[in-house]
């Protein structure tokens, strides 16, 4: 396996035993075969650690790391990123899935245009893995200003070129840590949309950010800008408020019915 062609896939895992096997199977079903999947177990208690270990024994492209104590997805992703060996970095949460051609289509898109940072459209599934009938896309190009305005990319769709972006590490915040990553990566490269539905996002699982109300979202966005990004209180408030406005815009412009 050549690092020149390798995709390192980052997957934090905490008590997703109901979904994680299907998530990993969607990686194994990729038409692009040069990948490593780095699963970071965040002290699972539902048997999913043993499940992934069994899958690792059958497929050496799967690597399992286990945190000594529960530290959250940000710390898990940071560790996986330090361990990653690939030219490309991709992300998949342990309750989401990819379409078989996801990696192949996205790499071809980035190589054809010389892009270092990209994302794709995806469809939403409910917690029972049934389609909600919603397709989520986004702006064709996201600049630094655009990324601060709103977290447009779905985590399960993002890919960037490690050789151009370098090692990315974020502060150990408990929510919006994927957004914190994109705010780091966008400093190195604009983000471009491959407007094809290449992933399936599981919405509404207990504990996921989509199950909380607007009050919690406001608090977490302020915390992201104030503490992870170390912005002043007034700037953090303005960025938080802007995110609320652009969140409405996303619903109007970029969430479509299938």
Language model feature labels by segment:
Residues 89:
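Short aromatic/hydrophobic "clamp" motif used to bind/position activated sugar donors
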Residues 15-29:
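Short, well-formed alpha-helical segments that are part of the catalytic scaffolds
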Residues 82, 134-216, 220-221:
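Conserved nucleotide-sugar donor-binding catalytic segment
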Residues 67-84, 105:
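Glycine-rich, basic loop-to-helix element that forms the pyrophosphate-binding segment
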Residues 26, 33, 41-51, 69, ...:
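A conserved acidic beta->alpha catalytic loop
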Residues 18-21, 46-54, 97, 101:
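Acidic helix N-cap motif at the loop->helix transition within catalytic regions
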Residues 101-132:
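Conserved donor NDP-sugar-binding/catalytic core segment of glycosyltransferases
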Residues 5-8, 36, 180:
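Cell-envelope/extracellular polymer assembly enzymes that use nucleotide-activated donors
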């Amino acid at each position: 396996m050549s690092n020149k062609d390798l995709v390192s896939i980052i997957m934090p895992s905490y008590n997703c035993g109901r979904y994680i096997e299907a998530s990993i199977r969607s990686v194994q079903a990729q038409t692009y075969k040069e990948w490593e999947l780095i699963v970071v177990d965040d002290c699972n208690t539902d048997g999913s650690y043993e499940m992934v270990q069994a899958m690792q024994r059958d497929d050496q492209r799967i690597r399992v790391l286990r945190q000594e104590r529960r530290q959250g997805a940000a710390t898990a992703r940071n560790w996986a990123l330090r361990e990653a060996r690939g030219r490309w970095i991709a992300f998949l949460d342990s309750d989401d899935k990819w379409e078989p051609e996801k990696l192949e289509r996205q790499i071809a898109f980035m190589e054809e245009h010389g892009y270092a940072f990209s994302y794709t459209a995806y469809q939403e599934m409910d917690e029972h893995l049934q389609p909600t009938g919603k397709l989520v896309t986004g702006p064709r190009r996201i600049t630094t200003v655009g990324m601060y305005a709103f977290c447009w990319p779905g985590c399960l769709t993002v890919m960037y070129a490690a050789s151009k972006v370098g090692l990315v590490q974020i502060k150990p915040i408990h929510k919006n840590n994927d957004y914190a990553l994109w705010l780091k990566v966008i400093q190195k490269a604009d983000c471009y949309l491959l407007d094809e539905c290449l992933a399936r996002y599981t919405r509404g699982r207990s504990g996921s950010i989509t199950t909380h109300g607007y009050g919690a979202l406001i608090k977490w966005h302020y915390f992201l800008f104030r503490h992870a990004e170390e912005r002043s209180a007034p700037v953090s408030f303005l960025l938080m408020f802007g995110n609320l406005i652009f969140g409405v815009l996303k619903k109007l412009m970029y969430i479509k019915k299938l």
